């Protein structure tokens, strides 16, 4: 699956928001966005007027980059969100938040979603006691997510736990940080998910 390989802080400056792509630098307030909150390049401080389509496309790209999801997966999640009852945009965000890699990140066992995805794909994460290496797996209410015993002392996991202790844990997850496990207690409400995404624009884009 194709991933963005460029300078992620430059990307954040282009979007004008933190995408949580540089964990430790972001948590310490040393990211490029904290220092220069405008676009990269010679004319970065000028904001050109963008068309409606451009705004919609930018919002989708922002969401994909933030969560580390390919176009194929993102569209598939949108189709499922549209099938469900309720607001399609809210369903979209709630479904993405249920991805296993995102839940591991939300539990504070990794400083970025990319690092969380690596923990999952390399077999370091257990779901209800069984190893699961599929980052796109949708976690269900009541499921226990745990770092494998041999990985609990991994310096990166320990460091992530220390750093994310400053930011707190989202209300739909209960975490035992010392024991490196958590319970996904319920599905999140949209207003609880603090992300700089206007999902309405994404729905408009896919609805054309």
Swiss-Prot record:
Ranges of residues in domain S4 RNA-binding: 98-156
GO cellular component: small ribosomal subunit
UniProt xrefs under CDD domains: S4 (cd00165)
One Pfam family in the UniProt entry: Ribosomal_S4
Residue ranges, annotated region (Disordered): 31-51
Keywords, in A-Z order: Ribonucleoprotein, Ribosomal protein, RNA-binding, rRNA-binding
An annotated Gene Ontology molecular function: rRNA binding
InterPro entries hit by this protein: Ribosomal_uS4, Ribosomal_uS4_bac-type, Ribosomal_uS4_CS, Ribosomal_uS4_N, S4_RNA-bd, S4_RNA-bd_sf
Superkingdom of the organism of origin: Bacteria
SMART domains: Ribosomal_S4, S4
GO BP: ribosomal small subunit biogenesis; translation
Family membership noted in the UniProt record: Belongs to the universal ribosomal protein uS4 family.
PANTHER family given in the database record: 30S 40S RIBOSOMAL PROTEIN, SMALL RIBOSOMAL SUBUNIT PROTEIN US4M
Role according to the record: One of the primary rRNA binding proteins, it binds directly to 16S rRNA where it nucleates assembly of the body of the 30S subunit.
UniProt xrefs under NCBIfam families: PRK05327.1, rpsD_bact
Subunit structure and binding partners: Part of the 30S ribosomal subunit. Contacts protein S5. The interaction surface between S4 and S5 is involved in control of translational fidelity.
UniProt name for this protein: Small ribosomal subunit protein uS4
